[in-house]
Curated annotation (Swiss-Prot):
A single BP term in Gene Ontology: riboflavin biosynthetic process
Gene behind the chain: ribBA
Record: residues binding Mg(2+) 2: E28, H142
Record flagged with keyword Repeat: no
Cofactor note: Binds 2 divalent metal cations per subunit. Magnesium or manganese. Binds 1 zinc ion per subunit.
Record GO cellular component, one term: cytosol
Protein known as: Riboflavin biosynthesis protein RibBA
CDD domains the UniProt entry points to: GTP_cyclohydro2 (cd00641)
GO molecular function: 3,4-dihydroxy-2-butanone-4-phosphate synthase activity; GTP binding; GTP cyclohydrolase II activity; magnesium ion binding; manganese ion binding; zinc ion binding
Residue positions binding GTP: R249, L250, H251, S252, A253, Q270, E291, G292, R293, T313, S348, K353
Reaction(s) catalysed by this chain's protein: D-ribulose 5-phosphate = (2S)-2-hydroxy-3-oxobutyl phosphate + formate + H(+); GTP + 4 H2O = 2,5-diamino-6-hydroxy-4-(5-phosphoribosylamino)-pyrimidine + formate + 2 phosphate + 3 H(+)
Length: 393
């Protein structure tokens, strides 16, 4: 499929045009027509009903839903993706409420600041959906995408969406969506691209604290940050004056290795080696909450169970339904930019960290190898990292 950039899609939306938004292939893997309520014209919903044919819904922010008393359709939401349907509505000025014109009126009244809860009949023919406050950074759904896109165009936080169906009633995917795009000359974007757009556009960290931290390897300055959209807590150790071409270690949290000194991995040894190096040469350690390459502690323990049955660290993750590495280094890049650092010497054996930082504007001037000894318990793990994951060890 041929996707457009987010800026061109925003321009189309602001011109009153709908666009196609495609979600993750591991999710619904479908395309929705999306329009911004404030900018859409009288033909938008008619076009959705005639050409897309899916259910026409109206994503709104939580503030709008609460102000208009749009309560959840059911108390026990068992939808597989947790879509927050409210009770359906018609505006009181409609007749049957089902015509394209009347559904447009109902949608427009949702964003009218003078509208009140009593102005909507329930049930009706338009289906509001409530978006998560943090948008696609909290949930990668079409609901959140529509509200985020509305905000990015400067409009009130509401949209109208409709799934795209083929002529035979099946859901349009892949090349079907490409043909739909070309036939109707529409912009098409992915939710993944919208997520990356927002990450680059908006600050994601908040500085919270700074203290002196004496350790077995020297005394460091410890900074505490909070991730704005996930509430994760990140700590940073620094030694000496902070400067360009700083020596930097990105260390993914590993409770078993860092705290309990597990010999299944080399994480604890790499952390200690990096602390010694930074203490001697100056630099920074960014300690990221990315347990188990992003799958979390309990899932890492489940992966260990599979490793005991003959899997390796990569195939175990895959068997559990995860990619081999879920880590993203945008938060690390944001922290570096907080300290006005754009060029670093990276303490790492992992090429994916180089690429992960480069895509967020961080230049890697030099790689500093982190050398730690193998143990009888982590030999296979180290070999897998080298052979399957390309680690430079």
């Amino acid at each position: 499929m041929q996707f457009d950039n987010i800026d061109s899609a925003l321009m189309a939306l602001k011109n009153g045009e709908p666009i196609i938004v495609v979600d993750d292939e591991n999710r619904e893997n479908e395309g929705d027509l999306v329009a911004v309520t404030e900018w859409m014209n009288d033909n938008t919903i008619n076009f959705m009903a005639k050409e897309a044919r899916g259910l026409i819904c109206a994503p709104v922010s939580k503030d709008i839903a609460q102000r208009l008393d749009l309560v959840q359709m059911v108390d026990d939401n068992s939808d597989i993706f947790g879509t927050q349907f409210t009770v359906s509505i018609d505006h009181v000025d409609t007749t049957t409420g089902i015509s394209a014109y009347e559904r447009t009126l109902t949608a427009k009244k949702l964003i009218d600041p003078s509208s009140e809860a009593k102005d909507f009949n329930r049930p009706g023919h338009l289906f509001p959906l409530v978006a998560q406050d943090k948008g696609v950074l909290a949930r990668n759904g079409h609901t959140e995408a529509a509200v985020d896109l509305a905000k990015l165009t400067g409009a009130k936080p509401a949209g109208v969406i409709c799934e795209i169906m083929n002529d035979d009633g099946t859901m349009a995917k892949g090349q079907d969506l490409q043909k739909f795009k070309e036939k109707h000359q529409l912009k098409m974007i992915t939710i993944d691209d919208l997520i990356e757009y927002r990450k680059k556009l908006e600050p994601e960290i908040e500085f919270k604290a700074k203290v002196k931290m004496p350790t077995d390897f020297g005394t460091f300055d410890m900074y505490g940050f909070k991730a704005t959209y996930t509430d994760e807590e990140i700590v940073v150790l620094t030694k000496g004056a902070i400067r360009q071409h700083e020596n930097v270690r990105l260390h993914s949290a590993c409770l078993t290795g860092d705290i309990f000194h597990s010999q299944r991995c080399d994480c604890g040894a790499q952390l200690e080696s990096s602390m010694k190096y930074i203490n001697e040469h100056g630099g920074m350690i960014i300690y990221l909450p990315q347990e188990g390459r992003g799958i979390g502690l309990l899932n890492k323990l489940r992966a260990y169970e599979l490793i005991e049955q003959g899997y390796d660290t990569v195939t175990a993750n895959l068997a559990l339904g995860f990619d081999e590495d879920l880590r993203d280094y945008h938060i690390a890049a944001q922290i570096l930019k907080y300290f006005n650092i754009e060029h670093i010497n990276l303490l790492s054996n992992n090429p994916s960290k180089f690429e992960g930082l480069k895509q967020y504007g961080i230049d890697i001037a030099e790689r500093i190898e982190v050398i730690v000894p193998e143990t009888v318990h982590n030999h296979d793990y180290m070999e897998t990292k080298k052979i399957k994951m390309g680690h430079l060890i």
